[in-house]
């Protein structure tokens, strides 16, 4: 799995997404470390607003660590066009639905438009959140 100090992410994905026990083991190993690293990083920030991307935020109960949550999603067609993962539906099957995430979020954006549209959304969120 390790080659020259690098992780073969594709192979790890094949293993853990084929065996829920292996996935649980990996998540139990990684998630506490990621949370600790995010907390350390946040203490170092001096800007009035800091952004953290957390792919499994709601699934891991992590939303309580943040003042606001922004959910950015896209239609299934757009997701398929943007990903190289062949078994995306298997992986998405363990996630909350977009509707559930949107219902919990403070801000929601469906990213099916242009980069300019996304930039405008981000600017509007920053304007509302920045002191």
Question: Where in this protein do the model-derived segments appear?
Answer:
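Short beta->alpha linker loops
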Residues: 7, 29-30, 74, 96, ...
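ATP-dependent small-molecule kinase phosphotransfer cores
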Residues: 1-49
